[in-house]
Amino acid sequence: MSKTPGIDMSSGSLGQGISAGVGMALGAKLLKKPFRTYVLLGDGESQEGQVWEAAFLAARYRLDNLTVILDYNGLQQFGWQKPGEHMLPPIENPTLKWQAFGWNTLEINGHNIHEFVSAIQASQQTQGKPTIIVAHTTKGKGVSFMEDQFDWHARVPTNDELATALDELGQTGLFQESMAGGQS
């Protein structure tokens, strides 16, 4: 828990993060601690039953100190979330599903920082229920060869690809040097 300040844990694609987040938020409530818990959740991992069990419990315990940010881009590690292409169907209409579980729901353009900040601030004002921010995003947005390409889920760019991507995003100099880590 000491490598990245404010980041207490990371989890894989099986939905464990939200369960841990619910536990942290519940612990804070029980101990009367004033902190908030934030969970990043992918739409692909929302196919896991554990996510919905945690969602139910968070609403049941009125965890208004919990904010989940759902990255809703339609892609998961091995492809698009389309009916018939996977064993599990995609999570359609996530806002309605989370509302049905008793959550406060906010929808934003996940690429708009102003909408993002406003949603975080709104989530902090919600009382009596947890909040989910459904952030509609495009995987790899702004990089021509990465945009909407599921194979970039876990792939590291080469130095040349990194340079091209940073150029397309308008990033140069020190940032580019600090991000280098791939192979040419």
Briefly describe each language-model feature range.
Residues 35-39, 66, 129-135:
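Generic beta-sheet signal
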Residues 50-52, 78-83, 118, 143-148:
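Short acidic, glycine/serine/threonine-rich loops at helix termini
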Residues 113-184:
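Glycine/aspartate-rich loop-and-adjacent alpha/beta segment that forms the canonical ThDP
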Residues 41-48, 72-75, 111-113, 139:
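Acidic, glycine-rich active-site loops and adjacent beta-strand->loop/helix elements
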Residues 1-60:
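Cofactor-binding active-site loop characterized by glycine-rich and histidine/acidic residues
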Residues 33-36, 81-119, 170, 174-181:
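Conserved thiamine diphosphate
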Residues 60-87, 92:
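A short, conserved beta-to-alpha structural element at the edge of catalytic cores
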Residues 25, 40-41, 69-71, 134-136:
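Short beta-strand segments
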